[in-house]
Amino acid sequence: MSKISVQPKIKCFISAKTLLQNKEKRQNGLISFAIPDLGVLFKAHNFGSHYELEYISLLAFLRFIELNYKAFQNQKIDVLCSSPLLVYQMSENAVCQKELERHRSLALVYKEKFKFSLSWVPESENRAQNGMMDLPPLKNSLDFNFEDIQKKPW
């Protein structure tokens, strides 16, 4: 009898927050991503509409994966976010606003490269929105590269 090979799966969370209620107005905001199983939490300030920041958060996470590909090359990557719009627009035939198309196009290139899945999760379960206290105290044996994430390809 042959053994069934199961590919490891890793859950990653992305988030974007702005101060103003108007999600279409360009403003200062916070992008973040978390990989709880690895004890990774990344947060950075950025500028854009709330919807742009959601894409920028996804792109920052994908850039992190690209920079640290050896750590993720044999993993199935499940990206979870609290944005139904982002999940919808990243589906194959979705319509996207003109101002978001540049970000979406780049994210779709990454999607082909890394074969990640993108799903919705309620804000209360989005680990990228929470603080460091919610992540396990792991001694990380991997040498991750965070430095080049801010070199924005978007």
What positions do the PLM features span?
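Short amphipathic alpha-helical face segments that pack within enzyme cores
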Residues: 52, 56-60
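RNase H catalytic domain
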Residues: 19-23, 59-134
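Terminal low-complexity, poorly structured segments
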Residues: 54, 131-134, 138
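Charged phosphate-binding loop/patch that engages nucleotide di/tri-phosphates or the phosphate backbone
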Residues: 135-154
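RNase H-like nuclease fold core
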Residues: 2-52, 64
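Short, low-complexity, polar/charged sequence segments that are solvent-exposed and flexible
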Residues: 32, 97-100, 137-140
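Short C-terminal domain-edge/linker segments immediately following a structured domain
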Residues: 42-47, 74, 108-113, 148-152
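Compositionally biased, intrinsically disordered/low-complexity regions enriched for serine, proline
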Residues: 5, 33, 133-134, 150
